[in-house]
Amino acid sequence: MKQLLEVIDSAKSLIDENEKYIIFNDGKAIDTNALDEVEITLNEAIDFSDYLRKNDTDLEKLIDQNAKVKTLVSIKKDVDLKIIHVCDDAKYINYQIDIAKRLNVNLTVVYGYVVNDAKIKLDVLIHHKSVVNFREYHEFSGEAKINTSFYLLRFNQLNYLSLENNSNTNDLTLNMYLLQQDISLSCLNVAINESGKIQNQNLNVYHLHEDTASNFNTYAIANNNSILNIKNIGRINNGCPRCDLKQKTKGIIVDTYSNIEADPALIIDENDVMASHGASIGAIDPEVLYYLMSRGLTKEASEKLIIEAYISPYFKDYSETNLGKYILDKIK
């Protein structure tokens, strides 16, 4: 118990002044100061088949069958909210976030204290005319498999940012379902693999209605004999004209023995659309490195400066927050 309390105190150090929070331990909410803005219920769930009929993956089925508890977090008012996960025992975590209509929400989800092998499923439903800034930070020390799905309704605006800094094998799946018209989606994903192991990312955007727009950018870094596999799929269904889909992947391979594999794909079944994708993977530009070293920096310091600039979009207007400072200290 003493050790758990120490971890919770450490987790609370990531919370800024006047920020609302929920702390989860092994998938259960154990502490919050957001009861005016948020309702937390156990073993009640949104039926997402009311919004989209699809086949669940084997991982989703496994988590549904084995998670001891399912938690629903219902956001009812405008809020700046941080959700922090502490986990050292539960193997399966299953929860949902339901954001009501016409809200302005800044939401941060932190997996920074998950030390065991965990399989996690998060489903997020954003009702119409809401503006959501959603930030994630992953720091798994055990082997982790994460499936996160967003279901966006009409006139939504979602700005999604994530940073992966895991020290073990990791499989991440992110699904963005644009279900109704006039949805604007911006995604920034930063993946850092220095674990010496293989990490996989499957990043999917589905345009399932006309007049939707998405822009997905991934910045990847591999070092220390690590492998990072990134698969992007952007899909526009038939009958969904006037969609705009963009995706881009950039990668820096820091050492000789690491590798980044990027596999972008567009599946377009409609003519009246705009869609583009691209991938650029390679070592640090030697001319830039040489220039910095000629100014008196060591090779290591030069590489560090280049990488910090490379991932800086994640920290825009965020580097001075408690979590921003924590992450920057971790990746130095």
Where are the regions that the model predicts?
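Long, low-complexity, mixed-charge
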Residues: 1-70
